[in-house]
Amino acid sequence: MAILLCLIFSKYFYLVSLSSYYTFYLIDTFHVSIQQAQVMLFVFLAAVAAGTFLGGPLTDRFGAKFVIWGSILGVLPFTLLLPHLGLTGTIINSIAIGLVISSAFSAMVVYAQELTPGNVGAVAGLFFGLSFGLGGIGAALLGAIADRTSIGFVYQICAFLPAIGLLGALLPNPRAGPEVAAIAKPPAV
């Protein structure tokens, strides 16, 4: 469970860096207008929503561990590239980041529920609460770093957060308990 919590930390700190400061990064780096930056933020957040939606069927098809591993580690090349791209590349890259990194949330919840059968509600509450809490702490911390350095520096250091996804290799292969299996099994038609 501790490994999953580290993965949640890396994922939500990175997501909050984009959702909270992406517009400032675009304005500062590319000198776009506030309105243009907000449209680009909308495009990123739409990709996050789509990735979250797609994560469920991917988890059903390939398994939670594979989706967690693929999502958090798979986003690393995109996050490492982001601070070094031009405007068009940044927009395209942010769409890829949103789609890939957000696809793991449902997989993480399902995986944690498989690790702790009988605590399905507690696990879901822990993960939702923790993700929002870490996001709030991340926004404040990254804002303080940006104030002391620059918004570009924040994106350079945040680019490495998904590397924490290497811990995914240490995730055990859980056996679904009857509670999780009953939830995960589609109803007969």
Regions found by a protein language model. Name each.
Residues Q113-I151:
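A late C-terminal transmembrane helix in Major Facilitator Superfamily
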Residues Y155-L171:
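Symmetry-related core transmembrane helices of the 12-TM Major Facilitator Superfamily/SLC fold
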Residues T88-I97:
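Paired small-residue
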Residues M1-T52:
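Extracytoplasmic gate region of multi-pass secondary transporters
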Residues S103-T116:
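Intracellular juxtamembrane helix-capping segments at the cytosolic ends
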Residues F66-L81, Q156-A159:
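Structural signature of the two symmetry-related core transmembrane helices
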Residues G51-G63, A146-D147:
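Helix-to-loop junctions at the C-terminal end of transmembrane segments
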Residues L171-V189:
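Intrinsic disorder in cytosolic terminal tails and internal cytosolic loops
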